[in-house]
């Protein structure tokens, strides 16, 4: 749950206008993904991406990521939307991008995947659990294995690593610095300064 949300005040020709900080960032086409990725967070991110596409389908969108990961299907809804919309989505890791956060970081537009220098990036295989009858557990197990194959395939495509290398590296938690993530192919550049 989010605590205090800062507000900013802008002077316009019509007087002062106040925005919550997230609305102000959205005005600059910046979407902030922070915290655990679940259905609620994913719906909010998807809605913002769709809104920004409707506002200007030619202008890039910046997705800033500081996330420990979360639910695979929630993350895949963000991934599919990033690919569905016309604007390029640049991704920027601020702090950490772990699990589904790292996956989404790697899914930014080629040449537009960034990290700040002290951020940490971590990839691993899907986590899950099951209970119930043996046949139900088998169904869930097969679905987790299917999702693992899908995620590894996309990570291999995004990074340029072989599928075998991705499978090996995601077998356990695999942590990288921003520089290591660039060498691995998950990002394109480590940012030192905002050059806007």
From Swiss-Prot:
Binding partners and assembly: Fourteen ClpP subunits assemble into 2 heptameric rings which stack back to back to give a disk-like structure with a central cavity, resembling the structure of eukaryotic proteasomes.
Keywords: Cytoplasm, Hydrolase, Protease, Serine protease
Keyword ATP-binding on entry: no
GO biological process: protein quality control for misfolded or incompletely synthesized proteins
Family classification: Belongs to the peptidase S14 family.
Native species: Helicobacter pylori (strain ATCC 700392 / 26695)
Any one cellular-component term (Gene Ontology): cytoplasm
Protein name: ATP-dependent Clp protease proteolytic subunit
HAMAP family: ClpP
Stored CDD domains: S14_ClpP_2
Active site (UniProt): 99 (nucleophile), 124
InterPro entries reported for this sequence: ClpP (IPR001907), ClpP/crotonase-like_dom_sf (IPR029045), ClpP/TepA (IPR023562), ClpP_His_AS (IPR033135), ClpP_Ser_AS (IPR018215)
Catalytic activity: Hydrolysis of proteins to small peptides in the presence of ATP and magnesium. alpha-casein is the usual test substrate. In the absence of ATP, only oligopeptides shorter than five residues are hydrolyzed (such as succinyl-Leu-Tyr-|-NHMec, and Leu-Tyr-Leu-|-Tyr-Trp, in which cleavage of the -Tyr-|-Leu- and -Tyr-|-Trp bonds also occurs)
Chief subcellular location: cytoplasm
Keyword Zinc: no
A GO term, aspect molecular function: ATPase binding
Function: Cleaves peptides in various proteins in a process that requires ATP hydrolysis. Has a chymotrypsin-like activity. Plays a major role in the degradation of misfolded proteins.
EC numbers, comma separated: 3.4.21.92
Entries under Pfam families matching the protein: CLP_protease
Compartments, record wording: Cytoplasm
